């Protein structure tokens, strides 16, 4: 079985440094943070959260899961991510998503939600150029500039790894054209293998070498000895986060039950091709640290 990397989501905005240190001490390969400008409750900003985590750690990689790419101008995001990569001594991974499930945040940012895909594709082109070239000129639909050099450029060469999130075919094509990895969420093992094949086909059609492409997975976990309690907590946490009823579908999209149950379910994803597993916590707030420990010590070693 191929080795799998594991990441832990930083769940609280108030104890980021402590949680990041804990994840690093438990052997996680990544800590990760997502973002929204607004959502169904309080939500972080990915880059600020990861900057705090960077200052509290020395080894663990820092992944955005994800930055909402179309809500940034490419120059601003290129600058922020480059500085974060330099400040963290080359540990940043940029996961991007196009969003759209909460249109109000697009309205508030003055970005037409229907442009999110085209804006994201162009932004990826611009950011990669700014990360890797000097005296850059670009003329596109949304960005136009001449003679721009980003300083500093990222520590990682040729640039920080790019991960594309999303379940639609357009996201798979975006991953094939621009990214180093793919991170779907709310996905089943049955869907996974075929999607990886589709990404590689898109890459082949574009003439892009994807031999080092990394299929990832963003998944929720609720680890309790009692399987019913674990499922109930997963449904409650996901329902609160996404403002919908997860009572009948939490089991499809979360690892839940005791560590053995979680290993069994995760193996289905790994057998389907997942090689980087990023775990977010769908449990009681007071149980997050214990869940993080159980996944690190009793689930992850089976796939290392």
Report the location of each language-model feature.
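N-terminal beta1-alpha1-beta2 module of alpha/beta enzyme domains
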Residues: 1-56, 61, 157-160, 282-285
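Short, glycine/polar-rich helix-capping loops at beta-to-alpha or helix-loop-helix junctions
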Residues: 168-173
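Structural motif corresponding to the early beta-alpha repeats
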Residues: 61-74
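Acidic (Asp/Glu)-rich catalytic clusters
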Residues: 21-25, 50-59, 81, 85-91, ...
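C-terminal amphipathic alpha-helical "assembly" element
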Residues: 1-26, 93, 111-114, 128, ...
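Short, well-ordered coil/turn segments that N-cap beta-strands
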Residues: 2-6, 28-30, 57-62, 87-92, ...
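Flexible, glycine-rich active-site loops centered on histidine and acidic residues
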Residues: 2-11, 71-137, 185-186, 190-194, ...
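Alpha-helix-loop-beta-strand connector modules within alpha/beta enzyme cores
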Residues: 44-64, 119-126, 130, 293-304
